[in-house]
Amino acid sequence: MAVELRDEGAPVRSPADVHAVFAPRLEDLPVEEFHVAVLDAQHRLERDVTVTRGILNSSLVHPREVFREAIAERAAAIILVHNHPSGDPTPSSDDRLVTEQLVAAGRLLDIPVHDHVIIGRGRYTSFAQAGLL
């Protein structure tokens, strides 16, 4: 489900930009939500797509759902974003595995995954900054 954001069209050039756009909506949720930020060639946010809404601390993510809107929008790239309801943005082993799978799918589709940002309470983890992509 695509969501219209007031931030659409805003440049998203750093993990801090991602956090600024998504934290107000995600950091205090009681369940995990997984979003895809669809970017244009100038790294502007074209669309925010809510891929899944989980229960408590898990969220199932399938590449087909992640890339559906990106393909339709002719995305230049995407950024993966989800929250950890615990407030701790440390990536889990499942987070790492899903990210590897989605990066591989993005390569096949020629839609690069620029980052995966996990939102916690008042902080975040960027896979790109941490060297995990």
Regions of interest found by a model, annotated:
Residues 1-50:
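Long amphipathic N-terminal alpha/beta scaffold segment
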Residues 15-20, 42, 52-133:
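Active-site-proximal loop/helix of nucleotide/amide-processing enzymes and allied scaffolds
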